[in-house]
Amino acid sequence: MTQQPTLFIDRDGTLIDEPKTDFQIDSLEKLKFERNVIPALLKLKNRYRFVMVSNQDGLGTDSFPQEDFDKPHNAMLAVFRSQGIEFDDILICPHKPEDNCDCRKPKIKLLKKYIDKKLFDPADSFVIGDRPTDVQLAENLGIRALQYHPENLDWDMIAEKLLREPVADPKGLGQPRHAVVARKTKETDIKVEVWLDEAGVNQINTGIGFFDHMLDQIATHGGFRMNVSCKGDLHIDDHHTIEDVALALGAALKEAIGNKRGIQRFGFVLPMDECKAECALDLSGRPYFKFKAKFNRDKVGDFSTEMTEHFFQSIAYTLLATLHLSVKGDNAHHQIEALFKAFGRTLRQAIKIEGNEMPSSKGVL
């Protein structure tokens, strides 16, 4: 059997809602599908094989009788089948963490057949799940993970990431807009790679979890793909890592955009959610930056909120762009996320190719 593109998909919290009370789906009343999971799987099924992989603590014991599991589980499968969605395999670990078994995710014994017989294509297979253990499972399998989240990475976004094909020659203008920038100092060792004309799965690892998520928001909302890796002096603080990634990313974007012929050049967005974020961008060739925001705490996770301004200032400097950013709101997490999303959306407008003209009366940018 040849290697196949495969999605190893978690069940509770990914395909169906996981109750936060007891984390067990043991009745039909608790069965609730995640939003748009069925339309997404219908789009994905022609490209990928589906394998369900799930930890079910104490399944078959008094704390979780088999019959209590079977009824909602079989109902879930019946709904999927009625819509044309089939799982090639369903792999379940019934053990609790304290049992120290070899099959509980993120361990890989459940998937031994797929590993030994090389049944999945490592270059085009993914683990989809809502927990860090799903991400670790992907690492143990040598493939990539998509950590599902109903707001930050929902099923619509997952389907878009997995199905967006590379655009080898956008608008017939020649080479694809791609760049690689490596930057090494005493404090950081960074590599940034961007593909402006394709979207897909971004591989980002800076050692700062919240920052990784924010960088992914730029690419996702910008409609492009990027890989970012950084080893920095986080034992001191996060300053050098965030600043140097911004400098490298700005340089990579500038290089990928190239001579700017045919681009829109300008972008402006004003998204309204619980926060009001405003972003205006001009790929002018002249760096200028203005920022207005107040945060009510010093940290979001392991990310210093004061570094938000410094990140965008640094990216404007190496991108050679005029950038205005502001946000109003009460929640620092939401404020910062709104800024990164707004920047991504604005960048999406500015780098879009519409013709072959130089967007400047001077004839050069």
Swiss-Prot record:
InterPro entries: HAD-like_sf, HAD-SF_hydro_IIIA, HAD_sf, His_synth_bifunc_HisB, HisB_N, Histidinol-phos, IGPD_sf, ImidazoleglycerolP_deHydtase. One of its GO terms (biological process) is L-histidine biosynthetic process. One of its GO terms (cellular component) is cytoplasm. Pfam families: Hydrolase_like (PF13242), IGPD (PF00475). Residues 177-365 are annotated as: Imidazoleglycerol-phosphate dehydratase. Its main location: cytoplasm. Its cofactor is Mg(2+); Zn(2+). Keywords: Amino-acid biosynthesis, Cytoplasm, Histidine biosynthesis, Hydrolase, Lyase, Magnesium, Metal-binding, Multifunctional enzyme, Zinc. Zn(2+) binds at residues 93, 95, 101, 103. It is found in: Cytoplasm. The keyword Chloroplast does not apply. GO terms for molecular function: histidinol-phosphatase activity; imidazoleglycerol-phosphate dehydratase activity; metal ion binding. Its EC number is 3.1.3.15, 4.2.1.19. PANTHER family: IMIDAZOLEGLYCEROL-PHOSPHATE DEHYDRATASE, IMIDAZOLEGLYCEROL-PHOSPHATE DEHYDRATASE HIS7. This is Histidine biosynthesis bifunctional protein HisB. It comes from Mannheimia succiniciproducens (strain KCTC 0769BP / MBEL55E).
